[in-house]
A protein has these predicted regions:
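Short helix-coil junctions and helix-kink-helix linkers
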Residues: 36-46
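Short alpha-helical segments that sit at the start of domains
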Residues: 1-21, 25
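A short, conserved structural fragment
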Residues: 59-69
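Short, hydrophobic-biased segments on the C-terminal half of alpha helices
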Residues: 52-56
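Short, cationic-aromatic polyanion-contact patches
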Residues: 69-88
Length: 117
């Protein structure tokens, strides 16, 4: 089941970084994995408690589910990267409804490159 992004529930830039890490994982990552990968990929050296706070916010916003496996919490995305990308593109088109097709294609190409990574 694909969750629909609630237009009133936006995520911050930091939460978006964390979501990108979660989406890129093969399974549902734990706190240590997310903390380490945010530091490597984005250069953010956050403490585990900071990342855990962002995770709790993402859960409250309906973006992820948190579950325990043994003594570790794991994070499962409730919104797919595809749905997120679609939502971001629709936001853009809402801002610029009168763009020509070639302009739209150029912008979409740039957005996709940025969102991938």
């Amino acid at each position: 089941m694909t969750a629909i992004i609630n237009e009133n529930v936006k995520i911050s830039e930091c939460e978006e970084m964390i979501m990108k890490i979660i989406w890129d994982e093969d399974g549902d990552p734990d706190l240590d994995t997310v903390t380490d990968k945010v530091a490597i990929r984005f250069g953010r050296r956050w403490k585990k408690q900071t990342v855990a706070t962002f995770m709790t916010r993402l859960m409250k916003k309906g973006w992820i589910d948190i579950y325990k496996l043994g003594r570790y919490s794991h994070y499962h995305p409730l919104i797919t990267i595809e749905q997120y990308r679609k939502d971001k593109m629709m936001e853009f088109f809402d801002l610029y409804p009168h763009m020509e097709k070639n302009q739209i294609f150029q912008v979409v190409t740039e957005l996709m490159t940025e969102l991938v990574g």
